[in-house]
Amino acid sequence: MCISNTIPAMAIDVETRKPRLANVTGGLSGPALHPVAVKLVHDVYRAVARDSKTPLVGIGGVLKWEHAAEFILAGATAVEIGTGLFVDPKTPIKVAQGLAKWARRQGVGRVSALIGGLVP
């Protein structure tokens, strides 16, 4: 289950008083969405996925491994990288390497051992 790709948003040019987007509204994504997306993953994980083992995909604002780690701790079994690819095409490699090092520091052999590992 994919959790949060975009949320409805709008921007207005205050001088022309017109919408900045041709369709008036659009989807907010990237780093601005990240904290909202992490909370949504956590909510769905606690309500459904933890007990049902439903796979969750965290989406929104993954620019570095720490962002992916937040999704994993919140309950995501996978993480999608969109904006990060525009910023740096090597983002997926850097994220994977960072997650592997993090897992070792956490004392586990696999990143998957940290899914839903948020300590309240």
Please provide the spans of the model-predicted regions:
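Glycine/Thr-rich beta-alpha phosphate-binding loop at enzyme active sites
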Residues: C2-R50, T54
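C-terminal helical cap(s) of enzyme catalytic domains, especially alpha/beta-barrels
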Residues: I12-G26, L85-V108
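Alpha-helical structural signal in soluble globular domains
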Residues: D43, A47, A74, K94, ...
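Generic secondary-structure signature for well-ordered alpha-helical cores
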Residues: R46-R50, A100-V108, P120
